[in-house]
Amino acid sequence: MRKHYNNILKKFFWLKLIKSRTKLHLTQAQMSRKLIMEERSYIELDHGNACCSALTLALFLIYCCEDPMQFLAELKVEFEK
């Protein structure tokens, strides 16, 4: 059951990450610095090959997400489908 939610989060976060990076006009390297992570690790997120850690999610919500409450509301909807 937990793996199911992890897969939902992975896909949801990936879509939001790409949208945010595009909107902020940042390169992968710039986004990795904003999220305080190695560029190689960021690229794995950017390609949808990895799921975010709790720290990465928190940094994204604080520094990159236009509306964190909307993000969480939309994620809740995905979890409840």
Per-range role (PLM):
Residues 20, 34, 45, 74:
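Residues in the recognition helix of alpha-helical DNA-binding motifs
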Residues 2, 7, 69-81:
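Short, charged recognition helix plus adjacent turn
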Residues 17, 28, 39, 54-57:
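Helix-turn-helix DNA-binding elements, focusing on the entry/boundary residues of the two helices
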Residues 25-44:
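Short alpha-helical DNA-recognition segment
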Residues 21, 32, 61:
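The alpha-helix within a helix-turn-helix
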